[in-house]
Amino acid sequence: MKWTVAETRKGTRCRVLEGGSGTPVVFFHGAGGLLRDNPFLDGLAQRYHVYAPEWPGYGDSAGDELLEDMLDFALHGWDLVDALGLSRPHLAGHSMGGMIAAEMACLAPRDLGKLVLASPAGLWLDEHPIPDIFALLPYQLAELLFHDPARGQALLTGGADLSDLEALKEFYLGSQRRLAMAGKILFPIPNRRLSKRLYRLAAETLIVWGAADRLIVPAYAARWKALIPGARVEVLDGAAHMLPWEQPEAIIRVLADFLG
């Protein structure tokens, strides 16, 4: 896969990890951004033409000051689809990216093919409150997000040696920039009343969850299914919240079966 750049009419300029051929699939990342190693996207690009844009405020993407609320994020998603020259692509999103993809599908229900949501944010159950990721340290994030925290720590830091002060500084600055952007739609809780809009969703929908997810527990999968009649739910063993990175082959098999 290779990096390209997409510029939207609103003025955002976003890096896009692109590769593969065939049916277009646009993948929206979560609050942590795209990690250095992306076996899920690499594998998906063996079957589809994959576009994985970075949100403004992530990596070298610019224009974060232009996005202020959930509607801005959803419209930005469609602006990116237009900038990429795509017509009715499949949309997929992980965590925060799943929340945005679902909002996009409610906003323009006939403008996408199918919808894939991997451990999406966006709903709230009082009996299962979602932990505040903005109050956690990096090592705490790994314990919360990954089935294997040690491996997760290496993935989150890109293998950087955080005992090196410069590496630690660079990691924290990047993390703060990413979380400042994510906080616009996730803080103080990741609930922007999406449940009231899901009735508009017309696309066939697949919901995928990690059985060991400790951030957004699998009980949320049942709530999504209740709000999206006909939605298919798959729960993957050996994965927590970061299932695209923990079980890439398994999630690709499930997606390929669903997308065709």
Regions found by a protein language model. Name each.
Residues 51-92, 253:
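Active-site loop/oxyanion-hole signature of alpha/beta-hydrolase fold enzymes
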Residues 10-60:
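Conserved HGGG/HGGXW glycine-rich cap/lid loop of the alpha/beta-hydrolase fold
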Residues 93, 97, 101:
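Gly/Ala-rich beta-loop-alpha elbow adjacent to hydrolase catalytic centers
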Residues 102-107, 113-144:
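Flexible "cap/lid" loop of the alpha/beta hydrolase fold
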Residues 41-43, 200, 205-239, 245:
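Conserved loop-alpha-helix segment in the C-terminal half of the alpha/beta-hydrolase fold
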Residues 245-257:
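Post-His helix in hydrolase/transferase enzymes
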Residues 117, 127-128, 143-203:
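Conserved alpha/beta-hydrolase catalytic His-Asp/Glu region
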Residues 1-13:
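N-terminal cap/lid segment of alpha/beta-hydrolase-fold proteins
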